[in-house]
């Protein structure tokens, strides 16, 4: 079995994102049979190359002294890229502030209180042209793909592109957009789903053959996933399995949520194992509450399966706004840690280290 650990492509990524070619590019169309898809810049073009984390935050209205104090407490933020991480995240927070979704806080105050929200780093975990696969470490709060447009004929008989998506803030881009920018010569097919709120391993195929081989493994439940989660409370057991059936929550007006439905739901199974019990260190409403870091292994692959099975166990995920009462944590603490693909000729294991945020969010003693 080959183990493929995360390797950073940070230098090449920054060189590309800060190039004049990248900043002048507004969209990219494929010369393929399907309609061209819209493509949006991932970096914030308003941020000058080389801008520090401090100066970027100040430019978004953060108090300079408060920024310095935050950086003393969270020195890792100094390493975040201003153009591709901090500025897009701040634009996103300003978007939420404009919609009244940050309560009494401003975007700058929210970022300074829980600066982990500013992290948005992509990494290429594995690239194998001969097999036709690319594995990526996706940031949290980034959707998997961008809704594609279509071609229509205008009054002059010309084929013109109609888009289904308009970016809502500077840097409002998907994992697909990043893949298209980083690997512009490939067509990317996602081999599985990963929730927008979840970070971690995403496997893509660049050929139909590769996509078919991966789909077969997922269909036959031979592909194995491992997730890392931080949940509310201290489970009594160190290990347990949940078999609750899952189905659509027809009472949800937005049609987003699923629910436990033992009568009409689909069979679902997830195993859980406690890694560490401790206390939440996030500034805010959850500071000091009991939380647990744990590994989760879904046997089946239902939508929101891990999230629902943890809620069903009495331990919803920290930051899961759909299945917990937590509207204060800056992210949902669920990360796709590992993916094992047992192909006919060899078994490949794609893995990433646990995110730093998963270490910082929990302490052995109450803060």
Language-model-detected regions and their locations in the chain:
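Long, compositionally biased
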Residues: 85-103
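Short loop/beta submotifs within extracellular cysteine-rich repeat domains
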Residues: 77-80, 100, 117-118
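Pseudouridine synthase
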Residues: 172-175, 179, 208, 286-343
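N-terminal chloroplast transit peptides
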Residues: 1-21
């Amino acid at each position: 079995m080959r183990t493929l650990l995360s390797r950073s492509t940070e230098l090449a990524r920054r060189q590309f994102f800060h190039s004049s070619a990248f900043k002048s590019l507004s969209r990219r169309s494929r010369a393929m049979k399907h309609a061209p898809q819209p493509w949006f810049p991932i970096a914030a073009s308003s941020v000058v190359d080389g801008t520090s984390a401090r100066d970027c935050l100040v430019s978004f209205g953060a108090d300079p002294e408060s920024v310095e104090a935050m950086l003393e407490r969270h020195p890792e933020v100094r390493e975040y890229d201003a153009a591709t991480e901090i500025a897009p995240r701040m634009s996103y927070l300003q978007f939420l502030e404009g919609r009244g979704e940050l309560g009494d806080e401003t975007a700058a105050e929210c970022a300074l209180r829980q600066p982990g929200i500013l992290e948005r780093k992509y990494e290429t975990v594995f690239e194998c042209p001969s097999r036709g696969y690319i594995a990526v470490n996706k940031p949290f709060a980034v959707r998997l793909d961008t809704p594609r447009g279509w071609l229509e004929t205008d009054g002059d008989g010309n084929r013109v592109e109609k888009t289904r998506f308009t970016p809502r803030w500077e840097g409002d881009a998907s994992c697909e957009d990043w893949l298209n920018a980083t690997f512009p010569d490939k067509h990317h097919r996602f081999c599985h789903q990963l929730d927008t709120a979840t970070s971690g391993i995403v496997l893509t195929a660049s050929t139909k053959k590769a996509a078919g081989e991966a789909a077969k493994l997922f269909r036959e439940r031979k592909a194995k996933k491992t997730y890392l989660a931080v949940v509310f409370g201290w489970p009594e057991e160190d290990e347990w399995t949940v078999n609750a059936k899952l189905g659509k929550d027809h009472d949800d007006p937005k049609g987003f949520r699923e629910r436990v439905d033992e009568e009409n739901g689909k069979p679902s199974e997830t195993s859980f194992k406690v890694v560490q019990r401790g206390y939440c260190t996030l500034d805010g409403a959850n500071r000091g509450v009991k939380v647990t870091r744990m590994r989760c292994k879904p046997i089946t692959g239902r939508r929101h399966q891990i999230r629902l099975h943890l809620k069903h166990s009495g331990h919803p995920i920290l930051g899961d706004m759909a299945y917990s009462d937590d509207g204060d944590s800056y992210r949902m603490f669920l990360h796709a840690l590992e993916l094992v693909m047992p192909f006919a000729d060899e078994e490949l294991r794609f893995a990433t280290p646990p995110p730093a945020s998963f270490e910082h969010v929990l302490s052995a003693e109450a803060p």
